[in-house]
């Protein structure tokens, strides 16, 4: 298997070396000069950690560690049954200022097909809930947020499927969304389940609009990340910078994915 130009054993070795070199830091990242916001994508694995414990408070603590202005969560609702939301959103709002983008028809769920988009400032102008093709119930949540009187940001929160063919079809749907909307600064945040490169990769499909693609940052599995399943991408050059995994003792156990963070300049 080839991952970002390296073999899997090489990637594992680099991950081990990098883990030894990194110092744990549970405080929010210091904002780089010129950055307008901190954004993140986090597959919370239904709030079940690597210790197999269901602990939504622990998930919320990881979000507090990150200190994001916008964060896309995946697997934040039960997948079956009543698909109830798993987080205490009222408490998260009280402690972080983050509120969910509203969705319709979700019953007891927080979001759309497990996708929850939280933001700290601005006003939601428009929301689209997109069903993505494939055997699994995957979706994308598209929100346009007026940050102030002059700036509007479009955010696409998505969780692509496990099957390569499904991912390719789903990536094309994401591009269709972009082509059907007015041109504006757009972020794609999500678990794309894609680490391979090449013509058959969903990343290659997305590259036509979300380019240049930021460097791949391994986020899975959280204990020893070797696969860059999670991505933060933008449709404008220089909009996304300093993409990093939020790697702390807490985040390593809270989910099977590490959160991915980045700075955004508009």
Q: Which residues does each predicted region cover?
A:
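Active-site environment of divalent metal-dependent phosphoester hydrolases
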Residues: 47-49, 78-84, 108-110, 163-165, ...
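Metal-dependent phosphoester-hydrolase catalytic domains
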Residues: 1-28, 123, 129, 135, ...
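Active-site beta-strand/loop signature of hydrolases that rely on acidic residues for catalysis
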Residues: 38-44, 59-84, 154-158, 170, ...
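Metal-dependent phosphoester/phosphodiester hydrolase catalytic core
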Residues: 151-153, 160-165
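Transmembrane beta-strand segments that form the barrel wall of outer-membrane beta-barrel proteins
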Residues: 129-130, 156-160
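Structured beta-strand-rich core segments of catalytic domains in phosphoester-bond hydrolases
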Residues: 2-31, 51-52, 70, 75-152, ...
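Structural motif corresponding to alpha-helix initiation and N-cap regions
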Residues: 53-57, 85-86, 168, 226
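N-terminal active-site segment of His-dependent metallophosphoesterases
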Residues: 24-58
